[in-house]
A protein has these predicted regions:
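Acidic carboxylate diad motif detector
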Residues: 1-36, 222-223, 227
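Positively charged, helix-rich recognition surfaces that bind polyanionic ligands
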Residues: 39-353
Length: 353
């Protein structure tokens, strides 16, 4: 006799599920997922047609600046800044703990499979004890929770964004390319320090000692993309806005240069990744929010509407201040700028104006 699977009755308040179950069942499939020390089985029902709509699409346009770990948007009513999967660290910590524990147990129970240097011998087979299998199941469960959290968080942000507008202006992002390591090996001009026994530090540059030659790191944004899945957010946003009857515009990055332009001087200057603020006239702006503002002031795919920028810039500054005061979820970008605003003003020499 096969396994009996029961379906829970539909709740009266769950309108979405009631509408979905009115459609014709196309086919079913059984899905297995790890939960703590065992697997659980779920029946997934695929219905005919499109899914019911949960939200109401907003009206108006929106400038969206996407990053590998954050998004910033600006529209008629609001300027906001969000971190993708802000609480991902607790899931990463759990995965790390179980990974280390599983590797230790496997090494302890299979010492013959490792050489003198601690490397695995090719062709060796591992025997897992009951405790090792339990640890492995907990590790799989941790990965499942992380995946579910990323998907749930990104879907929530997509829905909140669609409630604000029906036209999104953004930059096309190739997250697959950003995740790859750099191919070229480049030397760095940074100074390395060597510590002596008397704890006195001696500065050594690459010109004074060949041993102290420093090289730039080849890693880029792979770790951040793995943790926060900005590619999933982008693809989900594009598919959902089309399904709800809205649209999106991908600007020409080479000509538009939303992250580089200053609408007052009308000049483009490429900033460093560490520079999170920009000086526009006499005002300091958060770089990502300002990029979203320039995307909002859209003329065509290659040009910014500078006249619209001048008209709306004061309104942008007010919205930025309100965002920094009210939304304490701004990670360390805008909050840090707010706390150190007076210092930044002095550094930029604004007291001279």
């Amino acid at each position: 006799m096969g396994k009996i699977m029961k379906l829970k009755p539909i709740r009266e308040k769950d309108i979405y599920l009631q509408e979905a179950m009115n459609s014709t069942i196309k086919y079913c499939r059984i899905i297995r997922k790890p939960f703590k020390n065992k697997y659980k089985y779920f029946l997934q029902i695929i219905m005919e047609g499109s899914a019911p709509k949960k939200i109401k699409l907003g009206i108006g346009k929106c400038g969206l600046d996407e990053g590998t770990s954050t998004i910033a948007y600006y529209n008629d009513t609001k300027a906001s800044f969000y971190v993708l999967c802000e609480n991902i660290k607790k899931y990463e910590k759990e995965i790390k703990e179980y990974t280390i524990k599983y590797e230790r147990q496997r090494r302890l129970n299979n010492p013959q499979n490792y050489d003198e240097n601690g490397k695995i011998i090719k062709g060796s087979r591992f025997k897992n004890t009951k405790n090792t299998i339990k640890t492995l199941m907990k590790l799989k469960n941790a990965y499942r929770k992380k995946s579910k959290y990323i998907k749930q968080n990104n879907n929530y942000l997509v829905n909140r964004l669609l409630e604000q507008c029906d036209l999104i202006i953004k930059e096309p992002m190739n997250f697959k390319a950003l995740a790859k390591r750099a191919k070229e090996t480049k030397k760095s001009d940074k100074i390395s320090t060597s510590t002596k026994k008397d704890e006195s530090k001696k500065q050594v540059t690459k010109s004074t000692c060949s041993v102290a030659t420093l090289y730039k790191k080849k890693k880029r944004f792979g770790s951040s993309i793995n943790k926060r899945a900005p590619g999933y957010f982008n693809s989900r946003l594009e598919s959902q806005i089309k399904r709800y009857g809205g649209d999106f515009i991908d600007i020409d990055i080479k000509n538009y240069k939303a992250s580089q332009y200053n609408h007052i001087t009308k000049e483009a200057k490429k900033p460093k990744l560490s520079e999170r603020t920009k000086l526009i006239g006499k005002d300091i702006v958060q770089r990502d929010l300002y990029s979203a503002f320039l995307l909002y002031c859209y003329k065509d795919k290659s040009h910014i509407n500078f006249d619209e920028c001048e008209k709306l810039f004061k309104d942008f500054l007010n919205k930025q201040e309100q965002t920094i005061k009210e939304e304490r979820m701004l990670y360390n970008y805008a909050i840090k700028e707010k706390e150190e605003l007076d210092k930044a003003h002095k550094n930029f020499g604004l007291n001279d104006f």
